[in-house]
Regions:
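A short, aliphatic-rich alpha-helical micro-motif
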Residues: 26, 162-163, 210-211
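Positively charged, low-complexity intrinsically disordered leader regions
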Residues: 3-48
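Short acidic, glycine-rich surface-loop motifs adjacent to enzyme active sites
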Residues: 164-177
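Structural motif
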Residues: 32-34, 137, 166-169, 198, ...
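Conserved phosphate-binding/catalytic loop of the ribokinase/pfkB sugar-kinase fold
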Residues: 114-120, 127-162
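Conserved post-catalytic alpha-helical subdomain immediately downstream of the catalytic base
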Residues: 255-256, 280-343
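Conserved phosphate/ATP/ADP-binding segment of small-molecule kinases
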Residues: 176-274
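Substrate-binding N-lobe of the ribokinase-like
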Residues: 7-23, 52, 56-124, 339-344
Length: 347
């Protein structure tokens, strides 16, 4: 039977108290972030009537906004917490790509490692909302694997950056950036250079794509689906999350699995044991981008000197910040410290 521990009580309080002084150690930590990127666009307005043309609401637009999305949000989370993010991704030759570059620069993330593919548009996700209610989402994207020539450029770009990096994050949104061959080549070369690889997996990607990575961070539903186990038959079992995690660890051939569990917190499954951590979310307005924040903060902390359980708690606190906000937003260093102080005062 797997040994289980919990980070709680006085041990948790002491760990949280240590975070402010340890944040400085992350300021020079460099992470390569690889993944599909795009713009999250919002059209906000009021609904007062139904269209006479069709039974749909008419949105009277009040404001519009664009934010960094997908792996670009991971990169800006790394930067906003004080690290350095080298973002490797593919964009189209269009105005959305130019907007992305501007927003990356303003978020202290260099756009210099983006690769242009004229055959595909830059991904955009347009959300039309009235108050907190989503009316519709419109996706502008092309889901297909890269050409051999563009994929080769992506791999070469990562290879060139590895010498100066401390670790690698692969953010998989299953839009075709990384084939199995490319992902495996990146993982193996990263290990050959002594760099840890952190993966946020996608439920539709075969588990073998991630073989050999050091840490994978699925949410509970993704973990169950990727494990191949039947959640309906297991949900009444108190140890089901351990069975899912261990099955996933073996199936993916990875060292460590971190399963984010919403209000139930987070569980780390290693070859030796399992560690449970509580949630730090006090109010949940929007979980969009929470997984991006978790892997960014966790990877930054771990390669910056935190043990893996400590890094998980660090990531959990950062996620508690962003779920209390609306939309895809990063956790800044100031936000983190303010939220941490409020947690300690309430403890």
């Amino acid at each position: 039977m797997m040994k289980e521990t919990r980070i709680e009580g006085q041990a948790l309080r002491q760990l949280l108290q240590s975070f402010p002084s340890r944040l400085d150690s992350l300021s020079k930590t460099k992470l390569i972030v690889i993944g599909d990127i795009g713009l999250d666009e919002y059209v906000l307005g009021d609904v007062r009537r139904i269209s006479p043309e069709a039974p749909v609401p008419v949105v009277e637009v009040q404001s519009q906004d664009s934010r960094l999305g997908l792996a670009a949000n991971v990169a800006q989370n790394v930067a906003s917490l004080g690290g350095i993010a080298h973002l490797v991704a593919v964009v189209g030759e269009d105005t959305a790509a130019e907007d992305l570059r501007r927003r990356l620069k303003s978020s202290s993330v260099s756009p210099d490692h983006l690769i242009v593919d004229k055959a595909r548009p830059t991904t955009r996700k347009l959300r039309v909302m009235s108050g907190p209610h989503h009316i519709v989402r419109v996706d502008f994207e092309r889901k297909q694997y890269l050409s051999a020539e563009v994929e080769k450029r992506v791999i070469q770009k990562v290879s060139d950056l590895l010498a100066s990096a401390d670790g690698v994050i692969i953010e998989d949104y299953a839009k075709g950036l990384l084939s199995e061959t490319a992902m495996q080549q990146i993982i193996k070369e990263s290990h050959a250079r002594g760099k840890k690889v952190f993966v946020d997996p996608h439920r539709s990607t075969p588990a073998k794509f991630y073989a050999g990575s050091d840490v994978v961070t699925p949410n509970r539903d993704e973990a169950v689906e990727l494990s191949g186990l039947d959640y309906d038959d297991m949900r009444m079992s108190p140890g089901f999350i351990l069975e899912v995690g261990e099955r996933l660890r073996q199936k993916m051939k990875v060292e460590n699995v971190v399963i984010t569990r919403g209000q139930e917190g987070m569980t780390l499954i290693t070859p030796e044991d399992a560690t449970h951590m509580t949630t730090f979310a006090r109010q949940v307005f929007d979980v969009t981008g929470a997984g991006d924040t978790v892997i960014a903060a966790l990877a930054l902390a771990h390669v910056g000197g935190f043990t893996l359980p400590e890094a998980c708690v660090f990531g959990n606190v950062a996620a508690g910040v962003v779920v209390g906000k609306v939309g895809c937003v990063p956790c800044t260093r100031a936000d983190f410290l303010e939220y941490l102080q409020s947690l300690l005062e309430q403890a």
